[in-house]
């Protein structure tokens, strides 16, 4: 199976319903990776056009950039954890991608802390 990925940066804020620093809105400089996979390449030898992939990811990230995640409808009733952020970006980006078999989004909250969400795409 072929895999193609790209990364973009996202700055956003969040808070949790807990006492202490995590309970106050605080920023994160996230690194977001979109990865797609499939068995077939097109006539150009591409799994996916990187420009189309970048447009899908940048469109999703653009809706979150500089925002307090808790205040967005995508996180209504959902804690803005890095896990839920990965799933939210996945849902927002996959609908804008050309047909692919599988996709995942990984969100890094620091150099060594990350969460990922991925799934097969129904065609």
Spans of features found by a protein language model:
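Charge-rich, low-complexity N-terminal segments
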Residues: 1-123
């Amino acid at each position: 199976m072929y895999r193609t990925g790209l990364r973009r940066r996202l700055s956003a804020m969040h808070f949790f319903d807990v006492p202490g620093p995590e309970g106050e809105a605080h920023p994160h400089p996230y690194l977001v990776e979109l990865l797609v996979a499939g068995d077939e390449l097109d006539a150009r030898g591409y799994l996916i056009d990187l420009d189309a992939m970048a447009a899908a990811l940048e469109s999703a990230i653009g809706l979150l950039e500089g925002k307090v995640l808790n205040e967005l409808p995508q996180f209504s009733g959902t804690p803005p954890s890095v896990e839920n952020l990965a799933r939210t970006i996945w849902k927002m980006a996959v609908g804008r991608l050309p047909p692919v078999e599988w996709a995942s989004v990984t969100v890094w909250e620091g150099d060594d802390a990350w969460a990922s969400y991925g799934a097969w795409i129904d065609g």
